[in-house]
Amino acid sequence: MTRSLLVPALLFTLAAAAPPALAGEADPAIKAQLDSLDIKYEVDSDGDFKITFDLGGGRSQLVWIRSSTEAYGDLKVREIWSPGYKHDGKQVPVEVANRLLESSHSLILGGWTKQKEFCMLAVKIPVNATPKQLRDAAEAAADAADEMEQELTPGKDDL
């Protein structure tokens, strides 16, 4: 195996074998994957990885890669979140909620969910996703959430 193939293969093996992160603890497998991709991040108080993607044209988008994972039977997934709309914290306006439902139908990855005062695009990927798959899912979340932010709050780039 050539050296260029050995490093990604080793990272994938380590990521697949790593134990799940405890609440508030950053997942070392995600750290290794992001570091291998030269993606800059911060670890928040929950142990999640916060990334700001530069989307060009003066726009940026926040994305969180969750360290905690969920399981259903033998399927283990992690979530990637990106906010697309901020509301008053009580209820999402009906028109916005309906638009997000319509959007969820046409998305290739993810769907919209309410997290406190934010409408978040939540993408679920296998825990053993490769670094490239992790990056692709995070970029897809950022792109879709930013498009929704532009549609629902024209002229703003707060998220």
Model-derived features with residue positions:
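Soluble non-cytosolic domains of exported or imported proteins
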Residues: G24-P28, K90-Q91, N128-R135
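Sec/Tat-exported extracytoplasmic proteins
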Residues: L37-Y41, F53, S104, A145-L152
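Short, internal acidic amphipathic alpha-helical interface segments
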Residues: K76-C119
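Secondary-structure transition/turn motif
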Residues: T52-G57, W81-K86, V123-V127
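N-terminal secretory signal peptides
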Residues: L22-G73
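Bacterial N-terminal signal peptides that target proteins for export
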Residues: M1-P8
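C-terminal partner/receptor-binding element of secreted or periplasmic proteins
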Residues: L121-L159
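N-terminal signal peptide c-region/cleavage motif recognized by signal peptidases
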Residues: T13, A18-P19
